[in-house]
Every structure is written in structure tokens, then in C-alpha cells.
């Protein structure tokens, strides 16, 4: 429960920070890079290099999307990036069914799910308020 509450706070702080630094054009897209990287980091902390590689392979779509949408102006990018955040939240909930990563703290999946849900939901809301739902115009 505390992981969900802290996750909600971190999600809101992420949105507020992006707005304060006027980073909505790039922050959410580049944030996609961190999602698989954290799981890989947990694996490395546990001394499981092969698991870290697997985490990054599974996370390649997030890395590619993050890089593309951070630097390229694309219509509906707020929607696509928001969906990627929401999909990662769902992945957090089922992650242990795909990969055994002993380095992942027990509190992390629900924490990350809530952060991802807050950020993804905000991006879908934002998509209706910026021209062409283009993050580069936010």
C-alpha cells in the first residue's frame, strides 16, 4: 500500500517537474528509457548479467520509442508515449511471470505501476490539449 502511495506522489512530482522546467517536449519520451534500465540495474545489483541483458532486450521497444519521440516531431506522440507508459505499468504487474529477476525489490512493481499509470494518464489528458497531440508542441 505504501508503495502505491509513494508511486502516486512520484508520478505527480514527475508531471509537476516536467511542467516547471518546460520539459514536456522531451522528458516523458526520454523517461521511457529509464523503464527497462531500472530492471536491468536491479539484475546487475544481484549479479545477474544475463538477466540484465534480457531486461534490456524486452525493453527495446521503450528505448526506441523514447529516442524517437524525444527528438522527432510526430502527430499523436502524446498518445503513443502515454500508451507506452501505461503498457509498462501493466508489464510491472506481470513482470515476474516473464523474467526471474531476484534483484527487484518486493515493493517495486506496485510502485512503478502507479508511477506509470499517473504519467501515462496525464499524457493522454495532455494529448487533448496540445495541437495534433504532438509532445514537441507542448
Indicate where each model-derived feature is located:
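Structural signature of hydrophobic alpha-helical transmembrane segments
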Residues: 1-9, 51-60, 110
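Membrane-interface helix caps and helix-loop-helix hairpins in membrane proteins
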Residues: 20-25, 44-53, 75, 98-106
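Membrane-interface capping segments at transmembrane-helix boundaries
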Residues: 19-24, 125-138
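Small-residue-rich segments of transmembrane alpha-helices in multi-pass membrane proteins
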Residues: 32-44, 66, 89-95
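Loop-to-transmembrane alpha-helix initiation sites
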Residues: 103-115
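Hydrophobic cores of alpha-helical transmembrane segments in multi-pass inner/ER membrane proteins
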Residues: 8-12, 64-72, 114-125
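N-terminal signal-anchor/start-transfer transmembrane helix
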Residues: 6-22
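Cytoplasmic-side transmembrane-helix entry/capping segments in multi-pass membrane proteins
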Residues: 25-34, 55-59, 79-87
Amino acid at each position: 500500500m505504501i508503495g502505491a502511495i509513494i508511486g502516486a506522489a512520484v508520478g505527480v512530482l514527475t508531471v509537476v517537474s516536467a511542467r516547471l522546467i518546460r520539459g514536456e517536449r522531451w522528458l516523458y519520451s526520454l523517461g521511457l528509457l529509464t523503464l527497462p534500465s531500472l530492471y536491468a540495474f536491479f539484475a546487475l545489483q544481484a549479479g545477474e548479467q544475463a538477466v540484465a541483458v534480457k531486461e534490456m532486450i524486452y525493453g527495446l521497444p521503450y528505448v526506441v520509442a523514447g529516442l524517437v519521440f524525444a527528438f522527432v516531431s510526430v502527430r499523436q506522440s502524446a498518445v503513443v508515449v502515454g500508451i507506452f507508459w501505461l503498457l509498462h505499468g501493466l508489464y510491472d504487474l506481470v513482470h515476474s511471470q516473464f523474467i526471474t529477476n531476484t534483484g527487484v525489490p518486493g515493493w517495486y512493481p506496485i510502485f512503478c505501476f502507479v508511477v506509470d499509470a499517473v504519467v501515462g494518464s496525464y499524457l493522454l489528458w495532455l494529448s487533448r490539449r496540445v495541437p495534433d497531440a504532438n509532445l514537441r508542441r507542448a
